[in-house]
Amino acid sequence: MEKYEIPETGRVTVLTGTQEIKVVEEPIPEISDDEVLVKVEQTGICGTDVHEYKGDPFHYIPIELGHEGTGTIVKLGKNVTKDYYGKTLKLGDKVVTGLRPCGECDTCKYDAEHIHLCEHGEIFGLIPGEEAIKNMNGWFGEYMKINAGGVIFNVSDMDVDLRTLIEPTAVVVHAVEKAKEVFNFKHGSYVLIQGCGPIGLLLLTTVRTMGIRNIIAVDGDNNRLEWAKKLGAHYTVNFMEEDAIRKVKDITNGRGADMGFQCTGSPKAASTIFKYIRRGGSMCELGFFTNNGDTTYNPHLDFCNKEIKVTGSWTYQADDWVHAMDVLKEAQERGLPVTGLLTHKYPLAKINEAMKMNMSMQGLKIVVLGE
């Protein structure tokens, strides 16, 4: 059996104040029979990490951030033999991890398919406090401990860059599944995606793998719109350079989009999305994982007169992770350059630079290495 030499200490990144992360040494935690220790390979920076870095909305301090990570099992509790879907786990396997449901609330007891709505669930990398730091419960470090009850997936058949995109792709896969509750996707449907950051571009990729032939990407950055084209957008609209509402109407023969996905965290954008959608159309809001403020809309023009069907989307269910893996593999097979979204990689010691690069909007998905 493969055995790994594990040092006595490992580096951990700790958010200690607004826009201040320190890299510190902590003893490698012991694991119980129900826990797993992972050597981190790399972790994507999420918009939520950046919000925390800037001091909003939760202001979790101190905390070790990072929830889009992947790595190698180097120590395995004797009771942990299979992943969430029954795939065998062993030392050396590559893994990702999702939610850690509480197992006690009504959702966990009576509606296990919707563990993402667990009343007391945790996401590794968003667990504040000194205990979580000493447990290495975030992915921005050299090692990461998956506590008992954490959802684990064996993804040894995927390369490291593809694995790094599984968590955000699970977010958009869940949004597509929610959208199916209010919209019947057809190959000829006009599907509009507002916001071409990593989430919007991964959603675009997901919709493209569904065979949708009329994808409209809306953003104010030409570089991001170029990426939208690379990933399969049929039409692009730059709202900074043209009358975006008129352009969308022209593309859709005067009707408007059949289905719209709102992927930004901008309250203004959350209002504008309704203007793009046809009468009888549908919309899914997935851009607000933090409270960025209120928006305004006209109840007559935006809802009643159009009878727009609306749904919201929140994180993901366990099934969405498996679907996300399939989406990424298919995208790669189709030649869609999805791993090109990982535009910058930084060593652990330069995590503050990585955060500031993300804030500058110069890249797409910024990655922190576990070394």
Model-derived features with residue positions:
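NAD(P)H dinucleotide-binding glycine-rich loop of Rossmann-like/cofactor-binding domains
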Residues: D83, E104-Q194
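Glycine-rich phosphate-binding loop and adjacent beta-alpha segment
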Residues: K229, P267-E330, G370-E371
